[in-house]
């Protein structure tokens, strides 16, 4: 019985649509195209396929430096909360590589954070759930993994 929401699967056994979605995302990320319409045309998929899978398909790579994950976190703008988030990550063994907080609007702040997972105690699911359990953290969105 499997637990968790993520699987690592060799792309050779999956329909090619998933790899095409990744290709379209890469075209956009690298700035080779500016519009989704252009990216999906080059990748050979429909816009509906792109929108259906874009938030669920990620490229996975193991590097010599370790695994890196990027999150987008929405939290109530409260004194000390950013510190609580960073303390939680370091307590779990994570190394914060980049952190960028947007200007708080309507009482909420947006945080983009990249973490080196190579020394984290536990798995990515546990880390994500722990971030969600921090008081006044409203949303933790998994952006990607390298």
Curated annotation (Swiss-Prot):
Residues 70-145 form the ACT domain. It holds the Pfam family ACT_4. It comes from the Bacteria. CDD domains: ACT_PheB-BS. PROSITE patterns: ACT. SUPFAM superfamilies: ACT-like. Belongs to the UPF0735 family. This is UPF0735 ACT domain-containing protein Cbei_1295. The lineage of its organism: Bacteria, Bacillati, Bacillota, Clostridia, Eubacteriales.
